[in-house]
Amino acid sequence: MSAAVSGVAPGEQARLPDYTAGSLAQLLPSVAGVLDVPGHVDSLGLGSAPRVCTVLVDGPGARLLAERGGHAPFLRRAVAAQPDGVLRELRTAVPSTTATALATLGTGCAPGQHGVVGYTAF
């Protein structure tokens, strides 16, 4: 017996999150490594830079940006400026809510470590 998994495209399989390989949790620690902050390494292989600007786009994934890039001219220009024409795709946190993803980005930890797995609106 099989069941459809919500949010998984037909023909794809659901994957368990891996916060050690190309993850949102690695972004700011890698940036710190690029900037030679003691105790941090560039685990994403970002390269060297005297300054770094991180741009957060909340909501669309890589697939939506590829399909609707015309609606995001800044991102379209950023992609075009890359030598291979693509930006690096990072995996988000699970669950992929804004609160969980921002806590993962800001702490460099997986949701099970930082404990923010959602939010409540009153």
Model regions: which residues?
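Active-site nucleophile/metal-coordination loop of metallo-enzymes that catalyze phosphate/sulfate
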Residues: S2-V52, G59-F122
